[in-house]
Amino acid sequence: MKRALWVLAVLLSHWRRHKMQFATLLIGLIAATALWSGVQAINQQARNAYDRAAATFGGVRTAMLVAPNAATFPQELFIKLRRAGWPVSPVLEGRVQINGHSVRLLGIEPVTLPVDVGNAPRLGATDLSSFVAPPGQTLVARETLRGLQQAEGTAPAISSGARLPPLRVQPQLAPDVLVVDIGVAQRLLSKPDQVSRLLIGKPRGKPAPLASVVGEQLERVEPNAETELERLTDSFHLNLTAFGLLSFFVGLFIVNSAVGLAFEQRLPMLRTLRACGASARLVNTVLVVELVALALVAGLIGLACGYFIAAALLPDVAASLRGLYGAQIPGQLSLRPEWWLAGIGISVAGALVAAATSLIKAIRMPVLATGQPGAWQQRQRRWLILQSCAACGAFAVALLLLHYGQSLIAGFGVLAALMFGAALILPAFLDIILLVGQRFARGPLVLWFWADSRQQLSGLSLALMALLLALAVNVGVSTMVETFSRTFIGWLNGRLAADVYVSASDNAQGVAIRNWLKDRSDVQAILSGGRAEAQFQGQPVELLGLPDHALYRERWPLIETAPRAWTRLVPGNAAFISEQLSRRLNVQIGDVVEVPAPGGTWELDIVGIYADYGNPKGQLTVNVAALIRQFPQTPQTRIGLIVARENIPGLIAALQKQFGLDDRRIADQATVKAESIRIFNRTFAVTSALNAFTLGVAGIALLTSLLTLANSRLPQLAPLWAIGLTRPRLATIELTKTLSVALFTALLAVPLGLLVAWCLIAIVNVKAFGWRLPFHVFPLHLVELVAVALFASLLAALLPMVRLARMQPANLVKVFANER
C-alpha cells in the first residue's frame, strides 16, 4: 500500500508541473458530464411529468371501461356493474376555463376509487368528509395553482360563471388537472348523471361477464406501459439525447487528447518507476485510480454545471413540448438521486474509455521504448490505416441501416454510423490534402510548413474530429430548421385562409354571431368549421370539417390528390388524410377508411394527402356539413371570415362590443400567424442552444490540444528560430497552419453536414413525426458557419500563439541542450 501511495505521489507531481494539462483534462470531463447530465435532467423531468399524468385517476396505466365511440354514458351502467360484482369507480372528464387558462377537470368517486390507481390521494375519514361534503374541495398541483394565479382555499369561477369548490394542494397530481367529487363535476360540466369512464380495481371474486351486464355499451381498455404522450414525445427526447451524446463524445475527445499527451510526457517517469522496482500492474493500477479520482471530482463539478444548463433550457423545452404535443411539464427542476449517481458513473466511465487507448499503449510499450521521443509516432501510420478501415465499416453499417431499418432508432443509427465513420476517416483525408500541398510546395520554408503540418496532425486529429462533428451537426440541424421554417411559413399561409377567426362560447352564441355577420356589408364570406374526435384503428383521430369554398381549394396544402378531389369531398363520402396519419396507418389515395361515428360506421374514400406540421394527432379533413350529420354533438363555434384588410380592425371591435368577445376568442390572421411563428421559433431555441454548446466544446477541444502540444512543438520550432526566424513570425506560421487545417476540416464538414440534413429530413423526421420536408440548401448560411468555425479556431489558437511569440529565448536554447 505504501509503495502504491509513493507511485501515486510521483504521478501526481506531473500535474503540478503541467497545470494547463490538468485544467484541460478537467475541462473535458466537466464539459462532457455537464452537457450529457443536463440533457438527461430535462428528459427525466419530462418523463416524470408523463408518469404523473398517466397515473392520474385512470390514465393509461389503469384498466378501464369506456364507450366504443369515446362519448359519455349513463351513470346507471356503473350501478349495474357494481351490483354484478365489478369493482369499478366512475370518472367524468372535461375541460374548463379559469381566467382564460384551460385545464382538465376530473370528477371522481373517492369511496369506490381503486387503491392501486397511481396518483390517487389517500383520503382519511376527515379528508373524505371535506372532499365530498359541501362546499367540497378541488385538488390541484402546486404548479397549477401558480399558473392559475390563485391561492389555496380560494374558489375561482369558471367561464360559465359557476364556482369551483375551494382549492387544496395535492402534490402528486399532474399539472393542469383539477380533481373534484363527481357530483360537482357533473354540475360544472353540465353533464348530469353522465360518466366518461369506469376504472377497474382488483376483483375479490369472479364478476359476471361484461356483455351480460351492459351488452355492447362498454368495452374494456387494458393498461398500457407507455402512454400516447410518451410515444409522441419519444422523438423529441431522442433528439435531445443525441445532442447530449454528441457533446459528451466531443468532451471525451478533449480528455483523450490530454491523457494521451500526459502519458507520452510521463513515459520517462514510468520508465524510472519500473526501473525502481514498481511492477507494470502496480503502475497501471495507480494510473487508473488517479484517473477515477479526477473523474469523480470533475463529475461532481460537471453535474452542478449540468443542473444549471438544464434549469436554463427547461422553460424552452417545456414550451416546445406544450406547443408540439400539449404535454404539461413543470418549469422547475426536481431531480432524483439516481440522476446524480448516473452522472458520476458516466463521468468515470467516460474517462476510462477516453484513456483506454493510452493505457493499452503504455502496457504494451517495451520499457526501453519509453525513452524514445518518437515511439508513439512510429505507430501513427498503422493507426491511420486501421481508422480508415473502421470508417469504411461504419459507412457499411449506415448503408445497411438505411436499406433495412424501419424504426426511428434505425434512423438515428444511420446518422451515428455516418458521423462516426466521417470522424474516423478525417485524419486520412487531411493527411492526403497536406501531402498534396507538400508535393507542390516550392522553397524550404513552405515545404517545412506542409511537412510539419502532417507531423502535427496526429496530435490535433481528435480535436479536429470534434470540430468536424460539431460543424456537421450545426450545418445539418440549421439546414433542417431553416428548411422547416421556410416550409412552415408557406404551410401557414395555406392553412390560415381566413382573415379573421372567431370562437364562440357555445352553439347558441355561434348562431347569433353568424346571423349578425350576414347583415354586415364588410364581410365577404362566412366560413364555418368544426372539429370532432374519433378512434380509428386504435388511435385517436381528429376530424376537421371545412366549408366548400374556393379559398380552401386554392390554398389548402395538398401534397397528393385524386382527380376532382374537392368535388368528391362535398357529398360527405370522401376525406383528405394528413401526411403523418397516412404514413402511420399506411393509407394511400384510393383506400377506404371506416371511422366509428355515433350513428354507425362512416366510410370515407381517401382522395387527398396534405401536410399537417406540428399536429401530434392524425387528422382527417371532411366537409363540415357531413361532419355535423355524422357527429351531431360537434360544437359549431368555429367561424372564419373573409374581410378586406382595411375593414379588419373595425369588424373585430364591433364583434367584441356586440358579443363581449375577448382576445382569446377573436383574432386576425396576422396575430394567429405571429403567435404560431413565435411558438415555432421557441420550439427550436433548445436546438440552437445545444448547437452553440456543441460548437463551443469543439472550440475548447481545439484550444486544449494546441495548449498541450505547445511544449512538445519546441524541438520543431527551435531550429527555425536558430536560423533566423523571429518568434512573432514563428507564431504567425503556427497560427496559419492551425487555421489551414481548421479550414480544410470545415470545408469537409459542409458536405457531411448536408448529408446529415438530408438524413434528418428524409429519415429521422419521417420516422419521428410522419412528415417529409422539401430539401433546401442555404449557401450564405454555410459560408457563415465556415466563418464561425474559423473564428472559433482563431480564438482557440490565439493563446498558444501569443505564448510562443512572447517566449523567452532561453526556453528555445534549452532544446539544443536537451532533446526533450
Q: What is each PLM-predicted segment?
A:
Residues R17, Q21-F22, L26, T33-G59, ...:
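Alpha-helical transmembrane segments
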Residues H18, F253-L296, S688, I700-L743:
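Interfacial "coupling" helices/loops that link adjacent transmembrane helices in transporter permeases
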Residues L139-T154, F576-V592:
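Short, solvent-exposed hinge/capping segments at secondary-structure junctions
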